[in-house]
Amino acid sequence: MTALLELCNVSRSYPSGEEQVAVLKDISLQIHAGEMVAIVGVSGSGKSTLMNILGCLDKPTSGTYRVAGRDVSTLDPDALAQLRREHFGFIFQRYHLLSHLTAAQNVEIPAVYAGIERKKRQARARELLLRLGLSDRVDYPPSQLSGGQQQRVSIARALMNGGQVILADEPTGALDSHSGEEVMAILRQLRDRGHTVIIVTHDPLIAAQAERIIEIHDGKIVHNPPAQEKKREQGVDAAVVNTAPGWRQFASSFREALSMAWLAMAANKMRTLLTMLGIIIGIASVVSIVVVGDAAKQMVLADIRAMGTNTIDIHPGKDFGDDNPQYRQALKYDDLVAIQKQPWVNSATPSVSKSLRLRYGNIDIAVNANGVSGDYFNVYGMSFREGNTFNAVQQQDRAQVVVLDANTRRQLFPNKANVVGEVVLVGNMPVIVIGVAEEKPSMYGNSNLLQVWLPYSTMSDRIMGQSWLNSITVRVKDGVDSDQAEQQLTRLLTLRHGKKDFFTWNMDSVLKTAEKTTYTLQLFLTLVAVISLVVGGIGVMNIMLVSVTERTREIGIRMAVGARASDVLQQFLIEAMLVCLVGGALGISLSMFIAFMLQLFLPGWEIGFSLTALASAFLCSTFTGILFGWLPARNAARLDPVDALARE
């Protein structure tokens, strides 16, 4: 009869300092299918090491171990995990149930790693628990089960994938006598159903219930009677077979890893929340700085645009402060007409100005009188509170009309509802008020002088007596590049004058400078926020490293029931990612709350959350989870199952 399990000259030694300590010495053993074997020996005799080798949790240092004719030394770690998953079922003295799972969920674990569909494995788990008398304890956590009930759950878990070979390590060691008898009765029933049952024990009463007792002492077998041939029932419990396609197996595996990660997080709510806190603060900081910073930038740029950022000012001379008499009369009315004919010009206005006294009744105030065209207010995007600007006829006739700014109106007419039609004196010339304009803020701050505007022809001929212009302001059409417009303007006037006796000031350069400055500031603040996110990620890594240490035995249990190293890596990596993703979602919610509160106190701010910002936040949190979760996950996947199971 061919042996199911066969050890030939197997030895196992472990390093101890510079020496090797032999635990098993030249073991040769055959165990046939359907046997019930007891391995006995005193503590330290090597029986647990022998069981670990039989269960493919450990490999011999020398010698050969075959399972159903397959030499396990030729198998890689994934193949060994598959062998454990499909052929072996473990029953431990301390049950080794996962405390955050129910009885049914504990039983399902081997089938999860076998890739069995959820409905099939749930039905299988309930069937096994029903057979073992636990139908009313299916949804109970281990803490609500007695020792005997927990061991029966452990037996059901061992049978989940078929359990051709049952390895029971001191299965009654932690039970009272009655519960111990029940467990042994179940093991005998499994033997009768065709399972191979191997019991490791030091209790002679337990060993006596086996058909064959193998005694081990100081790493050597000292008693090994031959196997007894008996006719038994045929048909070991059939495992639930996975017939799903490869992509569906992968999707199912990922979904189950996600579910297990969520359960593990829920089992330690406070620790999970504290772990998330760093990510929440980091993501909230990044998102808040991006969206609030963008809102602040747009507000600043809007204020700058309101001053007329698509305007170009033309002044006589070489630069500001140049009072050379030969350049003073450089700009003429004909230059204005030529500029207005250019296709890229929206509007243009001349400007001549002088400080004068403005009088109405007994009120006498100083004002800055500006001679402009009717397009001036369009060039600077100014609106009217009352009345309107002067028209072409009034400009041509040098009409004695004036537009006041809001501050001037308030000084002259504090109690009048409508001032259009009132007559005031500008210098010594009477003029009629035809409008009140809302003045836009200046790039250089608001002057303390009050402003009034008259037709430039009126200002030049009637008040100043000059034929030249102090400056010309050009508004460029929307969509036209301001720099190119400035170059064309310079060429036009240079050709007209025969020389460059003027200079230009492009307000678009102010906008570009402001954009660059705000971008630099926002980038700096974002980098500061990213540092907080990195600190949060390091916190996740620290907690996950602690979690791996705390859950070492859990990792050993999962490997014993068939989890591959990649399964463990995937689970812990998903846990880290899930912590960061949930933390990222909470961080985004916090940033939205911050934005809402800011809008309550700063109603002028328009804070919006773009899909790009939200997607970037989730990508950041996912990347953080992968980056800082990989090291703990790798450490978990590299654990030796024997060492992991031995940890307290």
From Swiss-Prot:
Instruction: Tell me the disulfide pairings in this chain.
Output: none
Q: How does it sit in the membrane?
A: Multi-pass membrane protein
Q: Which GO terms describe its cellular component?
A: plasma membrane
Molecular function terms, GO-annotated: ATP binding; ATP hydrolysis activity; transmembrane transporter activity
Tell me the ranges covered by the ABC transporter domain, including all copies: 5-243
Q: Does the keyword Cell membrane apply?
A: yes
What this protein is reported to do is described as: Part of the tripartite efflux system MacAB-TolC. MacB is a non-canonical ABC transporter that contains transmembrane domains (TMD), which form a pore in the inner membrane, and an ATP-binding domain (NBD), which is responsible for energy generation. Confers resistance against macrolides.
What family is this? Belongs to the ABC transporter superfamily. Macrolide exporter (TC 3.A.1.122) family.
* UniProt protein name: Macrolide export ATP-binding/permease protein MacB
